């Protein structure tokens, strides 16, 4: 079982982890959860975002 000081330290570290980006470790904005906007844009980029109209082979 954790001592009161160990428990307090664990809580402090837990809050710090919750307020940092899971990918790069940058501090998160109040409205961000898990990852920062830069990592989100990088991780969630759509590989089909520049699709071109397919040509018919008739």
Curated annotation (Swiss-Prot):
Q: Per UniProt, what is one Pfam family of this protein?
A: NinF
| Superkingdom classification of source | Viruses
The family classification in the record reads:
Belongs to the ninF family.
Q: What is this protein called?
A: Protein ninF
Source organism of the structure: Enterobacteria phage H19B
Q: What is the lineage of its organism?
A: Viruses, Duplodnaviria, Heunggongvirae, Uroviricota, Caudoviricetes
* Gene symbol of the encoding locus: ninF
């Amino acid at each position: 079982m954790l001592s009161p000081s160990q428990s307090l330290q664990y809580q402090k570290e837990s809050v710090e982890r919750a307020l940092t980006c899971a990918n790069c470790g940058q501090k998160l904005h109040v409205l961000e959860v898990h990852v920062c906007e830069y990592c989100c844009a990088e991780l969630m980029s759509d590989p089909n975002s520049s699709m071109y109209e397919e040509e018919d082979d008739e």
